[in-house]
Amino acid sequence: MQAILSSWFIQGMIKATSDMWHKGWDERNGGNISLRLLAEEVEPYRRDFYQHPRKVELTQPAPELANSWFLVTGSGKFFRNVELNPAENLVLLQVSNDGMAYHIHWGLTQGGLPTSELAAHFQSHIVRMQVSGGTNRVIMHCHATNLIALSYVQKLENASFTRLLWEGSTECLVVFPDGIGIVPWMVPGTDGIGTQTAEQMREHSLVLWPFHGIFGSGPTLDDAFGLIDTAEKSAEIMVKVLSMGGKKQTISREQLIALAARFDVTPMAAALDA
């Protein structure tokens, strides 16, 4: 067995993709994850790498990510199959030193490419690296059922959507005080939707793609998963509340401010006033 299969990052990706599939967020080949790795984390597994790594040109140059390593889910791959055959469904790649291409060093044993949303992932990684001082290393996308459902019936505006989720569960303001960003509906797998997502990622760790899914970022796979899980739980509660006729009482603005003070977070000001 290849040593890399027992690495923390392969095992972590197996756990994340399995959990997300069991949640019902990643039907068929839906969803994608990218994890930025450090050179020293990858180095011990070089003996498992391809002798002649395949080079693929990027549709959008990413010089800010030059020489960076990423573990990424494959395009057209099913999350439910990652734990059965990680080498077929995942890919370890390194961006070239000019940021114009990447080399596939491991994975995708049956051929193929990384996720079709790689442009969105890379653009979001660049922004989250900047705003987090390099601590954010994960971009995660999935089709979270109730967040998608709310996008059909709620105003697609950052502040009001954030406020709705904050009121849906007390922990939400603590977990994502920076709120949720929203992009217009756009064709997926394009540089354009990647640019729009990255712009929202500058202010928000969560970005909603209406009628499609959610993007989340964080330092670790657990953090990114937990962020989406928390928002999706609140969305599920609000879907049930709306189905029962709507709110009769809720968490007030003053209570949200008190909550933020207790947990020493700075809430999105526009959402407090929404």
From Swiss-Prot:
Role played? Catalyzes the reversible cleavage of L-rhamnulose-1-phosphate to dihydroxyacetone phosphate (DHAP) and L-lactaldehyde.
Enzyme class label: lyase
Q: Where in the cell is it found?
A: Cytoplasm
Q: Which UniProt keywords apply?
A: Cytoplasm, Lyase, Metal-binding, Rhamnose metabolism, Zinc
What is the catalytic activity of this protein? L-rhamnulose 1-phosphate = (S)-lactaldehyde + dihydroxyacetone phosphate
Quaternary state and partners of this protein?
Answer: Homotetramer.
Which Cys residues form disulphide pairs?
Answer: none
Q: Which residues form the active site?
A: 117
One Gene Ontology term from the biological process aspect of the record: pentose catabolic process
**Positions of Zn(2+) binding:** 141, 143, 212
In short, the EC number is 4.1.2.19
Q: Which domain of life is it from?
A: Bacteria
Q: In which pathway does it act?
A: Carbohydrate degradation; L-rhamnose degradation; glycerone phosphate from L-rhamnose: step 3/3
Family, similarity comment:
Belongs to the aldolase class II family. RhaD subfamily.
Q: What is this protein called?
A: Rhamnulose-1-phosphate aldolase
